[in-house]
Design a protein with these regions (language model features):
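Short, well-ordered secondary-structure micro-motifs
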Residues: 178, 198-200, 230-231, 266-268
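Mid-to-C-terminal alpha-helical segments outside catalytic/metal-binding sites
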Residues: 270-308
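Soluble non-cytosolic domains of exported or imported proteins
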Residues: 24, 232, 236, 269-273
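A short, acidic, flexible beta-alpha connecting loop/helix-capping segment that sits on the rim
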Residues: 46-47, 262, 297-302
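C-terminal functional module detector
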Residues: 233, 240, 244, 249, ...
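Short acidic/histidine-rich active-site segments
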Residues: 222, 248-272
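Extended, charged catalytic domains and RNA/DNA-binding interfaces, predominantly
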Residues: 1-220, 225, 239, 243-246, ...
Length: 308
């Protein structure tokens, strides 16, 4: 299993008495990653620009916490910076930990800070969150706006460095533009299908197809508000979105991006160790074993191998 998005580091820094990365009260920890046979977990460093007076300082604090926890539990998990690192984790039966930034605005439009983030081991950036920033417009804003000149420069530099560009939270116009700018795949790390659930945060059909045509992946988001009308995150709704995305973008586009520890905890899938229930549900819905393996890890693994 590869999960392309969680907010566990945010919970650990905000609730230090609720456990650490090895064992905690949230949805993801090392114990449960091992129990769930996880190959790789992306850990997002999320910063709310409107809540933080020093957004870059908040990012640095979260990164330092991530580093210290990975070092403390290095017998079980490793911070990966390249696909070679991922391969070593697989061979040694360790969980691979990918580090990402959720909210490109924390870098303030500064290419030097982007280079430093890369040097510090960040390999994926979600360009926007819910506010306009130096890079572009979020899905909550004008859907037709494009990336800024700074945003274009950032994306081009990310491609040069070998970083994954993430369009989850980005508006439609900016996402369309990524298809023209990039020569490599890009992803929507935690997004669903707008035609299934009419939320602007979800992807319209033409962007599902675009991401698929570029060789990218779309990670299924478990947030109940993006899945349907139920008050809980239901397995049936996740399957419905997954099958729809496969139908529109192909079986090579689908992946997992749970958003665990960043969404409400009312989920039928109890935590990251409970993902076998979703696997069984997709098999029961008609996916072959190979198609389900693609969804659970092979598609994301292919993309990581191509970019990192």
């Amino acid at each position: 299993m590869i999960d392309l998005h969680c907010d566990t580091i945010m919970q650990l820094i905000d609730h230090p008495h609720d456990g650490d990365l090895f064992s905690n009260n949230w949805k993801i920890d090392i114990e449960r990653l091992i129990k769930g046979h996880s190959r790789l977990q992306d850990f997002a460093l999320f910063v709310d620009l409107e809540e933080q007076d020093d957004s870059y300082g908040r990012y640095e604090s979260m990164r330092q916490l991530f580093d210290s926890q990975i070092q403390k539990y290095s017998d079980y998990i490793s911070h990966v910076r390249s696909y070679d690192d991922i391969t070593v984790c697989y061979e040694n039966h360790k969980v691979a930990a990918l580090l990402s930034i959720e909210e490109g605005g924390v870098l303030g439009g500064d290419l030097a800070k982007l280079d430093k983030a890369y040097a510090d081991g960040v390999r994926l950036i979600t360009l926007t969150w819910n506010y306009p920033n130096e890079l572009g417009e979020p899905n909550t804003g004008d859907s037709h706006k494009k990336l800024t000149e700074t945003g274009i420069a950032f994306v081009e530099r990310m491609q040069e460095l070998g970083m994954i560009v993430d369009c989850s939270h980005l508006n439609d116009g900016g996402t369309e533009q990524l298809g023209d700018i990039l020569d490599v795949p890009f992803i929507a790390s935690h997004s669903n299908a707008r035609e299934v659930t009419a939320r602007r945060r979800n992807l319209p059909d033409h962007l599902i197809r675009l991401i698929g045509e570029k060789g990218g992946v779309i990670g299924l988001n478990f947030a109940q508000s993006f899945l349907g009308t139920s008050s809980i995150s239901r397995i049936d709704d996740i399957v419905k979105h997954g099958l729809y995305i496969i139908n529109k973008g192909g079986e090579d586009v689908i992946a997992l991006g749970t958003d665990f520890d960043g969404i409400k905890p009312n989920t039928e899938i109890e935590d990251i160790s409970d993902m076998h229930r979703l696997y069984d549900a997709f098999r029961g819905a008609g996916l072959s074993e190979e198609q389900t393996e693609k969804l659970f890890w092979k598609n994301a693994d292919r993309l990581l191998k191509e970019i990192l």
